[in-house]
């Protein structure tokens, strides 16, 4: 039986999880390269190594943890725990004192972010959205990165 509309609970969960993920990715994408450069006088090679390591971590994590979350079937748990640890790992950057540790922590942060957001959240959206609503849901998801940039850059 097809639903007439998506519940308010679904929309609230969608916006909270998606916006949380987008704010965290925006922080990483806008500030971590500048952070490693300004805090440790990192070279272009150091910054490139961090970006490369983070990208590889994200790709592998999304594939592997996506399969794990499919097998386990508890996407909300992967999302909730992943987002919390992701946030804590971002806070940990305030206590880092070396280029190498920054690169390692960026990969750790990316692992939890990719698990929560890329693997579990995106699959959860597909699992909980009937085909007739996917355009509307994806439209909201597409707007949230822009809102996240305004939140991060604006204050």
Please name every model-derived segment.
Residues 2-55:
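Helix-loop boundary and gating motifs at the non-cytosolic
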Residues 19, 89-93, 99-117:
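Hydrophobic core of transmembrane alpha-helices in multi-pass small-molecule transporters
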Residues 41, 73, 95-97:
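Helix-breaking motifs and short loop linkers at transmembrane-helix boundaries and internal kinks
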Residues 59, 135-155:
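Glycine-rich segments within core transmembrane alpha-helices of 12-TM secondary carriers
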Residues 61-74:
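Helix-to-loop junctions at the C-terminal end of transmembrane segments
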Residues 77-92:
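Structural signature of the two symmetry-related core transmembrane helices
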Residues 115-129:
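Intracellular juxtamembrane helix-capping segments at the cytosolic ends
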């Amino acid at each position: 039986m097809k639903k007439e509309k998506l519940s308010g609970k679904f929309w609230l969960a969608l916006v909270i999880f998606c916006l949380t993920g987008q704010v965290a990715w925006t922080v990483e994408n806008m500030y971590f390269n500048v952070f490693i450069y300004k805090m440790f006088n990192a070279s272009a090679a150091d910054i490139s190594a961090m970006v490369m390591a983070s990208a590889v971590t994200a790709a592998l994590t999304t594939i592997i943890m996506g399969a794990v979350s499919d097998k386990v079937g508890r996407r909300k748990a992967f999302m909730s725990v992943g987002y919390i640890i992701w946030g804590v790992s971002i806070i940990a950057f305030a206590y880092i004192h070396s280029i190498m540790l920054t690169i390692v922590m960026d990969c750790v942060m990316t692992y939890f972010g990719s698990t929560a957001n890329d693997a579990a959240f995106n699959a959860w959206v597909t699992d909980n959205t009937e085909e007739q609503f996917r355009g509307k849901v994806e439209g909201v998801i597409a707007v949230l990165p822009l809102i996240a940039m305004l939140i991060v850059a604006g204050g």
